């Protein structure tokens, strides 16, 4: 069953053919549950919906899958629209809004709306407090969520407004990681489409993705969505990464071994 899951996922992202054998209703139901748990419901459905009727899931499951995929896409579209509106308001106040994590990594997907995420993470280039105040002026709500970030509520969108990038707990390695990420994010940001949202460089996203996934792995484990983020980043922008510099940073932040494991999994299972 897990083997078939990876066949479907590779076919969905265009890195391999799907081994096509007839699946029972129970097998399809199990595959669907795996996709939901691993955070790739919509990505895999993009391929499943192209299967001929003789190979596709039964209609009841197909409609359930379609409903779940549509709900994710609609949620992500609302998030994108509201985030762009909020970024425009920040731009009027000369507050840059650089997106982190989900919305940034989504740019590496064939359809960015198919990368699932629950809220918007952003970094305002040292103007966090001004951004918090602006959100309140715009009728939103704000609450501090520890030293790392605040939670903003704006027109139904939850925004994590970051003061720091990681839960570094004032450790020597954590302070170094923050400093390196700060250097990278200041070097380059590019507009996302025609919006005022800014996306960090490939160098920043690579280091941040790996540190973020490593944190999840240590705390509660990671899902295939994290590995897929890394695989698609490599597929889309590996030529734009300063590899000698990044590898040095990974060594200094003790992320190199984890990066190697993530890459090995991505290559072996996602092509």
Predicted stretch roles:
Residues 1-118, 124-271:
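Conserved NTP-donor binding/palm subdomain of two-metal-ion nucleotidyltransferases/polymerases, i.e.
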């Amino acid at each position: 069953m897990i083997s078939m899951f990876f066949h479907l996922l590779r076919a969905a992202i265009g890195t391999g053919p799907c081994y096509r054998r007839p699946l029972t209703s129970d097998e399809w139901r199990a595959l669907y549950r795996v996709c939901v748990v691993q955070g790739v419901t919509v990505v895999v459905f993009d391929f499943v919906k192209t299967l001929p009727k003789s190979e596709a899931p039964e209609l009841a499951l197909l409609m359930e899958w379609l409903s779940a995929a549509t709900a994710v896409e609609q949620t992500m579209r609302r998030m994108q629209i509201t985030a762009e509106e909020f970024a425009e308001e920040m731009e009027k106040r000369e507050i840059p809004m650089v997106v982190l994590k989900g919305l940034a990594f989504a740019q590496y997907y064939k359809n960015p709306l198919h990368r699932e995420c629950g809220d918007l993470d952003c970094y305002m280039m040292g103007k966090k407090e001004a951004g918090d105040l602006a959100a309140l002026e715009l009728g939103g709500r704000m609450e501090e969520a520890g030293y790392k970030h605040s939670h903003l509520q704006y027109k139904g969108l939850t925004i994590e407004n970051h003061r720091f990038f990681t839960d570094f707990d004032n450790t020597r390695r954590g302070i170094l990681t923050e400093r390196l990420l700060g250097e990278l994010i200041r070097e380059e940001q590019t507009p996302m489409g025609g919006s005022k949202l800014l996306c960090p460089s490939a160098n920043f996203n690579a280091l941040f993705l790996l540190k973020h996934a490593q944190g999840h792995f240590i705390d509660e484990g990671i899902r295939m969505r994290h590995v897929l983020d890394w695989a698609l980043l490599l597929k889309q922008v590996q030529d734009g990464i300063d590899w000698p510099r990044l590898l040095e940073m990974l060594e200094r932040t003790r992320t190199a071994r984890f990066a190697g494991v993530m890459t090995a999994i991505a290559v072996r299972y996602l092509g």
